[in-house]
Amino acid sequence: MHVPPTDPARSAPPASPHRRRRPKALGLTALAAAMLMAVPTTQAAFGSDVRPAAAQEVVGGGDLGPNVLVFDPSTPDIQGKVDEVFRKQESNQFGTDRYALMFKPGTYNDINAQIGFYTSIAGLGLNPDDTTFNGDVTVDAGWFDGNATQNFWRSAENLALNPVNGTNRWAVSQAAPFRRMHVKGGLNLAPDGYGWASGGYIADSKIDGEVGPYSQQQWYTRDSSVGGWGNGVWNMTFSGVEGAPAQSFPEPPYTTLETTPVSREKPFLYLDGDDYKVFVPAKRTNARGTSWGNGTPEGESLPLDQFYVVKPGATAETINAAVDQGLHLLFTPGVYHVDQPIEIDRANTVALGLGLATIIPDNGVTALKVGDVDGVKVAGLLVDAGPVNSETLVEVGSDGASGDHAANPTSLQDVFVRIGGAGPGKATTSIVVNSNDTIIDHTWVWRADHGEGVGWETNRADYGVHVKGDNVLATGLFVEHFNKYDVQWSGENGKTIFYQNEKAYDAPDQAAIQNGDIKGYAAYKVDDSVTTHEGWGMGSYCYFNVNPDIRQQHGFQAPVKPGVKFHDLLVVSLGGKGQYEHVINDIGDPTSGDTTIPSQVVSFP
């Protein structure tokens, strides 16, 4: 899934598909005892490992557990502690360790925080400029020989950076959001050596200098400000970005919307004096630029004692009891097995994960169910399918939901789904959205193509995302490798701004993917009954490495109606491993050969 950037003078990685090599296994080291000096926060007494029975009152507030490391400028040996986490997590792609590195407001000098798997770094101010690094927050790809295409599951948030050499490096692929950041310099999105990279997502951020994507295949930037944008490979999409390049797809491949129709930034933890709170930003319509650039952002602050602070070992029964009592949910870093769905049926509930908190459904249950109510905010969670097939992993609203939530929509933000990779996993449909007006803001829904428990039937997952509600908006939709439809859209007036897809690598033959008389299931299917739908900046790639003779009829399928519109579509055959015959329906040139050159459609119909 990789080609050189458009300017070979700046970098020249070879053209070749991605994620074909397994990473080298590196031994895990124990965290140094000195790291424990970064003491987890304490507030009201919570802290017992013994969880209350569901019939008992669930207590809100408390400490944030051992995997949230909180620093202030006087903490000794900050660099050493951060480095120790990185050594543990640099190549720990399918491990169970989770960390959140939290920095109290202040100035930190000579810091280079390298961020590995399942690690989140964040400032604890209300605004990014409250917490300043004279230094860098870095993601590179030394662990994988300069290939950044497996730099998944990590995040940076709510910090200001003065990069040491003037440019910060954030060389990531999917599920690695860069939110609410102020880079007082440039931002390099490619690894050292300009190897392959497959990102990515920026939101609510200000980059004073130029952003250099270099070898990045695609990228989505929302409601931000940039000092310039260097290049594009296949698909660079912007909505509500000050300083974004002008609309010019296909050459250069820039898709630019002046504003984002509806957005609401992700909730985040911060310090108000000595008290921990969660800030819940307000919804914005037709947003452009950051939410914080003009001072205090609009939104609501919730004290920590209104949250059940969920720690590893907590049961779904207790989590649900907390919601029933009126508490919000703050998942501390860890892995949580649930034997029944986590159910959020109360309007305006916040469920926020720290450090890529991970939920695994046992015995085929659904991991998370959100009711058809107003304003639920779910953010910062990884749902990892279990070995017994789940019909669904995440549901928003029940089937047939009909409520009007336009004034106060439910949102899924940085909610990631994985089927296989860490071990056997199966799910029929990963995410089902029944509620009207839902916002899906940055998700990576991934049927694993490498790791443990991977095979056409071993990690069977027919459908990625199925949208049934009306007026649903997806901003930054990454869905890959499903056995049938990656995205199916049945609701009216849906919108998608940026879509990245790969079809499943491991189809054994043409018959395995045949969809009636259609060769292969579309990567993005709009049902024939739909009359209004619109999408911008959308790409699908194929790499049928098991059987390169497979033909995919099209990447996109939609009814030909005046209200169904697409802008800036592309399909790519990665190294000639399989081919597309068209881009959308029977429109668009076929891909051919092994040159990894996209076939594009600028507008549909």
Curated annotation (Swiss-Prot):
Native species: Streptomyces sp. (strain SirexAA-E / ActE)
Single Gene Ontology MF annotation: glucan exo-1,3-beta-glucosidase activity
Main location group: secreted
Family named by the database record: Belongs to the glycosyl hydrolase 55 family.
Name of the molecule in the record: Exo-beta-1,3-glucanase
Induction entry: Is up-regulated during growth on biomass, i.e. when the bacterium is grown on cellobiose, xylan, and various pretreated switchgrass samples.
EC number: 3.2.1.58
Keyword Zinc-finger recorded: no
Signal peptide boundaries: 1-44
Localization, UniProt: Secreted
Cellular component GO terms held in the UniProt record: extracellular region
Outcome following mutation: S198A: 13-fold decrease in catalytic efficiency while nearly no effect on substrate affinity
pH behavior: Optimum pH is 6. Maintains 70% or more of the maximal activity from pH 6.0 to 9.0.
Domain of life: Bacteria
Region of interest called Disordered, as start-end residue ranges on this chain: 1-23
